[in-house]
């Protein structure tokens, strides 16, 4: 279904776009020239049974998939998909609440996700393991290179509607949003907009096996008047595109150094989310990610580590 929806969307919306999904086959050890990141040194822990079930956000998959394959001793009849999934933030939160995942690698939860966990009587633990930047993207030909925090809020609340107002061309601003409960939308609402109401998102229709054509939040389209948002790692490594540029905020670019020193305004933590009654194997993996070897993997994949790495 997802493949057909993607095909249909491309037919209805030709041109360059950014879709927050990936081909997980690129992160398999049996694929030639795979994109898995190796550990520094021999694995300091290994799993031979009772493997933790991992899931999470699209942008976190390279981290937890690389860890899974590096730390697991996998028998021949092993069904990897029972333990390694990428159902994205919204569904990953549902799975951890329902007990169908042991660790999910995600951004902070939305208010709705917190309430659903509370309603289910589930206590979730949030362990930060990496630092990331929430970034704003525009067409590379857009003359605007930086916005202030207030200008960002004004654009996405509808108070500013023309690029000329912020030093750009005399063009209407086309804003693109992310679906409710996605990691990007949660950060946008909580850390960027704060209490300012956003304008309604653009929508598109896609095919649903159950309901025919349904409306969903439209994906970013990189027209010369567009602005959208995502996470730095996704925009610069997983979906790098020379036709897209990242804006500075308050004149500060979202570089690794500015994430590390906290100067970039929208620095966020990536979390490992677990249930409070986690297994010993799950606890072992959570703790490993905070060790120098685990933090080195975080750094080598392309994130900013929170703790010391291996020399």
Tell what function each PLM region has:
Residues 1-132, 137-311:
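Exported/periplasmic ABC-transporter solute-binding proteins
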């Amino acid at each position: 279904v997802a493949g057909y929806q993607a095909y249909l969307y491309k037919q209805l919306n030709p041109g360059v776009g950014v879709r927050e999904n990936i081909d997980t086959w690129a992160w398999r050890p049996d694929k030639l020239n795979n994109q898995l990141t190796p550990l520094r040194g021999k694995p300091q822990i290994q799993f031979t049974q009772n493997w933790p079930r991992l899931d999470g956000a699209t942008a976190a998959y390279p981290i937890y998939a690389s860890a899974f394959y590096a730390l697991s001793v996998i028998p021949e009849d092993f069904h990897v998909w029972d333990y390694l999934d990428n159902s994205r933030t919204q569904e990953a939160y549902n799975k951890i609440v329902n007990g169908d995942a042991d660790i999910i690698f995600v951004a902070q939860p939305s208010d709705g996700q917190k309430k659903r966990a509370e309603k289910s009587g589930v206590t979730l633990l949030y362990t930060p393991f990496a630092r990331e930047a929430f970034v704003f993207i525009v067409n590379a030909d857009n003359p605007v290179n930086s916005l202030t925090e207030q200008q960002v809020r004004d654009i996405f609340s509808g108070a500013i509607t023309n690029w000329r107002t912020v030093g750009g061309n005399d063009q209407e601003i086309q804003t693109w949003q992310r679906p409710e409960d996605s990691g990007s939308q949660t950060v946008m609402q909580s850390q960027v907009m704060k209490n300012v109401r956003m304008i309604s998102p653009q929508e598109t229709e896609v095919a649903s096996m159950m309901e025919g054509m349904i409306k969903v939040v439209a994906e970013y389209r990189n027209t010369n008047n567009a602005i959208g948002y995502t996470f730095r790692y996704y925009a610069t490594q997983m979906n790098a595109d020379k036709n897209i540029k990242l804006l500075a905020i308050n004149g500060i670019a979202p570089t690794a150094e500015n994430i590390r020193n906290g100067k970039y305004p929208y620095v966020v933590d990536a979390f490992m989310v677990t249930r409070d009654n986690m297994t010993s194997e799950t606890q072992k993996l959570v703790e490993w990610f905070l060790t120098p070897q685990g933090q080195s993997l975080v750094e080598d994949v392309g994130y900013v580590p929170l703790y010391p790495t291996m020399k």
